[in-house]
Amino acid sequence: MQRTLLLAKIHNCTLTGANINYVGSISIDEILLEKAGILPYEQVQVVNSANGQRFITYAIPAPAHSGVIELNGGAARLGIIGDRLIIMTYGQFTPEELKNYSPTVVIVDEKNRLLEVRRYDDLLVKV
């Protein structure tokens, strides 16, 4: 049996743009994607802490060190510039893969600059 757990998240980032005319997705600073281990076009769940919206889209890279977090297409209607977002990916794991597993959490400042990458070793999954 496989279980679905949090794989990684970019925590409390700031929405910097909304482009309703783009085909879809969320643009994320390439450095943040890399540090979180999120691949281009990977499915992500986005939670808008300002309005409670939760939605699924896919990630595309924005220029490295740009601080860009931009909602595109229809998702652009689900936030306004300055809203704080949590961007998450999930993975499927077997019991064997879960031994000593913990998610990756990317912490950023208000301009979406990388502050730290955390591994919650004190919250290891016990199987």
Curated annotation (Swiss-Prot):
The pathway it acts in is: Cofactor biosynthesis; (R)-pantothenate biosynthesis; beta-alanine from L-aspartate: step 1/1
- Residue positions of the active site: 25, 58
* Cofactor annotation: pyruvate
Q: Which GO terms describe its molecular function?
A: aspartate 1-decarboxylase activity
List the gene name. panD
Q: Which UniProt keywords apply?
A: Autocatalytic cleavage, Cytoplasm, Decarboxylase, Lyase, Pantothenate biosynthesis, Pyruvate, Schiff base, Zymogen
Q: Which InterPro entries match?
A: Asp_de-COase-like_dom_sf, Asp_decarbox
Q: Record-annotated residues binding substrate?
A: 57, 73-75
Consult the record and explain the modifications the protein receives after translation. Is synthesized initially as an inactive proenzyme, which is activated by self-cleavage at a specific serine bond to produce a beta-subunit with a hydroxyl group at its C-terminus and an alpha-subunit with a pyruvoyl group at its N-terminus.
Which GO CC terms are listed, alphabetically? cytosol
Summarizing the function annotation, the protein's role is: Catalyzes the pyruvoyl-dependent decarboxylation of aspartate to produce beta-alanine.
Main location class = cytoplasm
Return the NCBIfam families for the record: panD
Q: Which residue positions does the secretion signal occupy? A: none
Question: Any binding details for the cofactor?
Answer: Binds 1 pyruvoyl group covalently per subunit.
Q: What is this protein called?
A: Aspartate 1-decarboxylase
Biological process GO terms, please? alanine biosynthetic process; pantothenate biosynthetic process
Name the Enzyme Commission number(s) assigned to this protein.
4.1.1.11
What taxonomic ancestry is recorded? Bacteria, Bacillati, Cyanobacteriota, Cyanophyceae, Nostocales
A Pfam family this chain is assigned to: Asp_decarbox
Spell out the Gene3D superfamilies in the cross-references: 2.40.40.20
Where in this protein does the record say Pyruvic acid (Ser) is found?
25
The reaction(s) catalysed by this protein are: L-aspartate + H(+) = beta-alanine + CO2
Where is it located?
Cytoplasm
- Taxonomy, superkingdom: Bacteria
